[in-house]
Amino acid sequence: MTFKAGKRIFSAEDKFNSLYAIRSGAVKTQKYTYSGTNRISDFFFPGDLVGVESIGGSAYHNDAITLSDTTVCELPFNLLETLCDSIPMLRREVMILLARKIRDSDQMMANGRTLHGEVRLLLFLRDLYQRYGTQCQDGSVRVRLPMSKNDIACHLGLRPESLSRALHKLQCDGMIRNNAKSIDLLNMETNINMLCGQ
């Protein structure tokens, strides 16, 4: 299945039937809170499964919206359950995936409560690099940003102006190179350890 940028793969409260494996492109998941605030819960890239947080419920937990032209493979959940019953290794992989999702969610909540904006941003960029970044010839690492800066701010629990200040400070401190649709991280682990130790 192929979706143009900005299209919904599913919406919150749609009946939960399937997971979606991303083959190309990028997706964000979002949900509006009771107060009307939009909260972006995660970003997904090739190899990721979208919809796992809805397992066990009757409806999808949030909206899944494409950030670019995106191709996905639909995995009907009843078929996946049948395969997991007959293939223990697949069942184990699904369990690992769910456990990782819980850990990432817990870590995101903890970071939002305790870490400065610059540290939250660097940790987010490191996560993107580990998932789909590239190594540059000068030793830096590069992450492409298919999402908007406003989406990043919403995901990190920052105001857009706070994200802009964090980006500016990290660039002035020589920790990143902020490009239009990508960011280069310089001495990534050293800088994260230094900021976390402040």
Model-derived features with residue positions:
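Residue-level signal for tight coil/turn positions that link beta-strands
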Residues: 24, 68-69, 180
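Short beta-strand segments in beta-sandwich/barrel cores
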Residues: 8, 26-31, 49, 71-72
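Regulatory nucleotide-sensing modules
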Residues: 1-24
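Phosphate-/nucleic-acid-contacting segments
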Residues: 130-198
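Cyclic-nucleotide recognition modules
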Residues: 40-103
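Alpha-helix/helix-capping structural signal
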Residues: 24, 78-79, 100, 150, ...
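Polybasic "coupling" helices that flank or enter modular domains
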Residues: 89-157
